[in-house]
Amino acid sequence: MPRVKRGVTARARHKKITDAATGYRGRRKNVFRIAKQAVMRAGQYAYRDRRNKKRVFRALWIARINAAVRQHDVTYSVFMNGMKKVAIELDRKVLSDMAIADKAAFAALVTRIKSVVNAAA
């Protein structure tokens, strides 16, 4: 069996890592050992934060809905309870966008839910 030299595969492997590390500061961008560690850690952060992003955006949507609903003298929890009672299945992302972009439609929605909640109470 002939001897296989690793030049081509090693260069390709190193190039893949150094290409992924472009834009990093200091030796992290061009020293293979350090770049490899930096790329691995960046991958871990990216994996973790793809999951955290979902939590962060949900919290943002809830804060926006709460702020918009309080302008109509309703709390977020009462509003969402009314949404369930009326059987309107708009998610928080759409409600948040509606509160910003289409204030008239959002106000109509809030008044409808207020009437249902007040009738039940």
Swiss-Prot record:
GO biological process: ribosomal large subunit assembly; translation
GO CC terms of this entry: ribonucleoprotein complex; ribosome
Pfam families reported in the protein's UniProt record: Ribosomal_L20 (PF00453)
Protein name: Large ribosomal subunit protein bL20
Role noted for this protein: Binds directly to 23S ribosomal RNA and is necessary for the in vitro assembly process of the 50S ribosomal subunit. It is not involved in the protein synthesizing functions of that subunit.
Domain of life: Bacteria
Gene name of the encoded protein: rplT
Family designation: Belongs to the bacterial ribosomal protein bL20 family.
Record-level Gene Ontology MF annotations: rRNA binding; structural constituent of ribosome
